[in-house]
């Protein structure tokens, strides 16, 4: 039987949807300046790479069943439970954006944590699935930072193109 959902788990169910991260990216790209657009680009690239690594490379290699109770409220996913692809891509997006806009690290990480907690509470994933997904996301963002260092624009400076 699925566990009773708390307010955090309910919020997490909303936050675990990829369109939410697309909305965050859209607002940053439209309302922000050069740094925000750079953050969206970095976060988006990290998101796509982590999703590929978790869902296309690793999931087919690991045959892990979903936790008991998975799919009671809807159809059970047919892919392996390990690792959590949502967690991998969400974490990569958050860590990627935070490299360019460090002030967004805490609110984005809080939203992602709520989403990942709901994956556990709703019996969609084991704790280790979510931890592994987070590690993949962090690893992708780390490799991206080393291969494509963030561009630092001093506060108040106008970057090329007129944005900040």
What residues fall within each predicted segment?
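Alpha-helical transmembrane segments of multi-pass membrane proteins
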Residues: 47-59, 112-118, 141
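Hydrophobic, aromatic-rich alpha-helical transmembrane segments
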Residues: 7, 36-41, 123, 127
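N-terminal transmembrane-helix/juxtamembrane module of multi-pass inner/ER membrane proteins
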Residues: 1-25, 38, 55-81
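Core segments of transmembrane alpha-helices
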Residues: 17-26, 86-94
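Membrane-water interface at transmembrane helix exits
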Residues: 29, 54, 58-63, 98, ...
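Interfacial segments of alpha-helical transmembrane regions
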Residues: 29-52
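Short helix-capping/hinge motifs at transmembrane helix termini and TM-loop junctions
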Residues: 32, 62-63, 122-123
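Membrane-embedded catalytic cores of phosphoryl/pyrophosphoryl-handling enzymes
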Residues: 71-164
């Amino acid at each position: 039987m699925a566990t009773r959902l708390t307010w955090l788990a309910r919020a997490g169910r909303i936050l675990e949807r990829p369109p939410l991260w697309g909305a965050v990216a859209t607002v940053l790209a439209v309302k922000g300046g050069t740094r925000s657009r750079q953050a969206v680009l970095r976060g988006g690239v990290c998101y796509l790479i982590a999703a590929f690594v978790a869902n296309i490379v690793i999931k087919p290699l690991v045959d892990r069943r979903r936790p008991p109770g998975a799919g009671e409220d809807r159809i059970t996913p047919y892919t392996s439970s390990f690792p959590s692809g949502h967690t991998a891509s969400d974490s990569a997006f958050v860590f990627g954006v935070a490299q360019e806009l460090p002030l967004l690290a805490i609110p984005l990480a809080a939203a992602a944590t709520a989403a990942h907690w709901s994956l556990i509470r709703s019996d969609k994933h084991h704790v280790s699935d979510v931890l592994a997904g987070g590690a993949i996301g962090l690893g992708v963002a780390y490799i991206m930072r080393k291969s494509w260092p963030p561009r630092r624009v001093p506060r108040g400076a106008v970057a090329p193109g007129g944005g900040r």
